[in-house]
């Protein structure tokens, strides 16, 4: 009905094998397999990096906490000057 039947796919596969040969197709298949394997490896290595700290020297602080510390330091400086 408009779709491709199994026989049509089989004929296309035979034509491709005749055009390129089994050796070339085997090489393409192994290249494709290694590319997929490398992609999966890169994805699996990237996931633990999300849990790790981004920078060892950087500790994120809230702006409110930083402002409170600044106000406390100013109060201590005022007391020392007085």
Swiss-Prot record:
List the subcellular locations.
Cell inner membrane
Give the GO molecular function terms.
protein transmembrane transporter activity
Out of the domains of life, which is the source?
A: Bacteria
- One Pfam family recorded for the sequence: TatA_B_E
Protein name according to UniProt: Sec-independent protein translocase protein TatA
Q: Which InterPro entries match?
A: TatA/B/E, TatA/E
Major localization class: membrane
Q: Which PANTHER family match?
A: SEC-INDEPENDENT PROTEIN TRANSLOCASE PROTEIN TATA
GO BP, sorted A to Z: protein transport by the Tat complex
- Report quaternary structure and partners: The Tat system comprises two distinct complexes: a TatABC complex, containing multiple copies of TatA, TatB and TatC subunits, and a separate TatA complex, containing only TatA subunits. Substrates initially bind to the TatABC complex, which probably triggers association of the separate TatA complex to form the active translocon.
**Which stretches of sequence are listed as region Disordered?**
46-82
Functionally, this protein is described as follows:
Part of the twin-arginine translocation (Tat) system that transports large folded proteins containing a characteristic twin-arginine motif in their signal peptide across membranes. TatA could form the protein-conducting channel of the Tat system.
Q: Does the keyword Cell membrane apply?
A: yes
The entry assigns this protein to a family as follows: Belongs to the TatA/E family.
Q: One Gene Ontology cellular component annotation?
A: TAT protein transport complex
Ordered alphabetically, the record's keywords are: Cell inner membrane, Cell membrane, Membrane, Protein transport, Translocation, Transmembrane, Transmembrane helix, Transport
Residue ranges annotated as transmembrane are 1-21
Supply the gene name. tatA
Which membrane topology describes this protein?
Single-pass membrane protein
Give yes or no: UniProt keyword 4Fe-4S: no
């Amino acid at each position: 009905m408009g779709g491709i039947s199994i026989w049509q796919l089989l004929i296309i596969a035979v034509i491709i094998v005749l055009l390129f040969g089994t050796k070339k197709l085997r090489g393409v298949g192994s290249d494709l397999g290694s590319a997929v394997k490398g992609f999966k490896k890169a994805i699996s290595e990237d996931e633990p990096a999300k849990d790790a700290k981004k920078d060892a020297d950087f500790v994120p602080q809230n702006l409110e906490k930083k402002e409170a510390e600044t106000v406390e330091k100013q109060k201590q400086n005022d007391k020392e000057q007085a």
